[in-house]
From Swiss-Prot:
This is Oligosaccharyltransferase complex subunit OSTC. The keyword Transit peptide does not apply. Pfam families: OST3_OST6 (PF04756). Pathway: Protein modification; protein glycosylation. The gene is Ostc. Residues 54-83, 139-149 are extracellular. Its main location: endoplasmic reticulum. GO terms for cellular component: endoplasmic reticulum membrane; oligosaccharyltransferase complex; oligosaccharyltransferase complex A. Keywords: Endoplasmic reticulum, Membrane, Transmembrane, Transmembrane helix. One of its GO terms (biological process) is co-translational protein modification. The chain crosses the membrane at residues 33-53, 84-104, 118-138. It is a multi-pass membrane protein. Residues 1-32, 105-117 are cytoplasmic.
């Protein structure tokens, strides 16, 4: 395998360059990277790529039995389609659940007082459970009759 790597360098000669990092480029802080990851997670789970390509409406409308138009936030019976508000609401729930797991992880630090640990555990569990059960409610709105035991 080493000979295969050596073959191109028998013909090519590597230049002797001394590259330096520009002085205005700095290592971002951990919280900056974390914020970028959370924002990108929110946008991707919200279906921003789908929204840009398909250009769905922000909310839909449905005609009731009296002939009046009623706004709806969920595109029912379509798993592979969504309104913009539906994607944002689902993305908020997924992000809240992920943040709940991160809060639960942060509650394991050894130097946290007992009251703060209890509050972090409570907030983490509330975020995770609320996002889970609201996602189930959203699935029932999206696919009526689904998950009915």
């Amino acid at each position: 395998m080493e000979t295969l790597y050596r073959v191109p360098f028998l013909v090519l000669e590597c230049p002797n360059l001394k590259l330096k990092k520009p002085p205005w480029v700095h290592m971002p802080s951990a919280m900056t990277v974390y914020a970028l990851v959370v924002v990108s997670y929110f946008l991707i789970t919200g279906g921003i790529i789908y929204d840009v390509i398909v250009e769905p409406p922000s909310v839909g409308s449905m005609t009731d039995e009296h002939g009046h138009q009623r706004p709806v936030a969920f595109l029912a019976y379509r798993v592979n389609g969504q309104y913009i508000m539906e994607g944002l609401a689902s993305s908020f729930l997924f992000t809240m659940g992920g943040l709940g797991f991160i809060i639960l992880d942060r509650s394991n630090a050894p130097n946290i007082p007992k009251l703060n640990r209890f509050l972090l555990l409570f907030i983490g569990f509330v975020c995770v459970l609320l996002s889970f059960f609201m996602a189930r409610v959203f699935m029932r709105m999206k696919l009526p009759g689904y998950l009915m035991g």
